Regions:
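Intrinsically disordered, low-complexity Ser/Thr/Pro/Gly-rich regulatory segments
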Residues: 2-203
Length: 203
């Protein structure tokens, strides 16, 4: 920014929000959740899921395989209940999700998002977003934190282009956080590389 009477130049200082930065880069937002609105119920449920996975890894794997293979990772295809070998079973009904074995409760969640958090792995994304939000709230101007950010492809194709798990606007630099709670596959590496190719930056 030049000062006319002295012809001195000073750097301009401005703050752009996430929508402005993404808009300038030509990306179309389809959907996102502001981490400011994360519910305490979902954060607590995510913590319980984490404890369950750490304490009962075999049981979690069995239930998750059923969802991945027989439900094709679609929540709409999940049955109201399912019984596995060794008396393991899960049941979901009206915002309550239950995992039990031999009449012993291993996990009980009470939130409308229970199935999404458990089966889609959103529990880890939620915990990460919660931590980043807590950090942001302690910073000047509270940098924006978004979760589950979806972008649209170019043209008329409504297909989702990319999903960013957690997006942080830190001093005009967008930080993309990929959340993985399990094994990292080659597809995950490709996804991160695609984000770099689309939005720039380093890995």
């Amino acid at each position: 920014l030049p000062i006319l009477d002295s012809f001195e130049k000073y750097p301009m200082k401005s703050q752009l929000d996430n929508k402005e930065i993404l808009g300038l880069s030509g990306n179309i937002l389809t959907e996102y959740q502001d981490a400011k609105h994360l519910s305490d119920t979902d954060v607590q449920a995510s913590g319980l899921i984490k404890q369950f996975i750490e304490q009962y890894p075999k049981e979690h794997t069995m239930i998750q395989k059923f969802f991945n293979i027989f439900c094709n990772r679609e929540l709409s295809r999940l049955p109201a209940s399912r019984v596995f070998k060794n008396g393991l079973r899960f049941k979901q009904r009206q915002g309550t999700f239950l995992v039990a074995q031999q009449n012993r409760v291993l996990l009980r969640l009470t939130t409308p998002n229970a199935s999404m958090l458990f089966f889609k792995g959103r529990w880890w994304e939620t915990l990460v977003a919660h931590k980043v939000r807590s950090w942001s709230q302690k910073r000047p101007n509270s940098p924006e934190v978004w979760q589950s950010v979806l972008f649209q492809t170019e043209g008329n194709n409504p297909r989702t282009k990319n999903e960013v798990d957690v997006l942080l606007n830190n001093q005009q630099k967008l930080i993309f956080i990929e959340c993985k709670s399990g094994q990292v596959t080659q597809n995950d590496i490709y996804k991160i590389d695609a984000v770099r190719e689309t939005y720039g930056g380093d890995i």
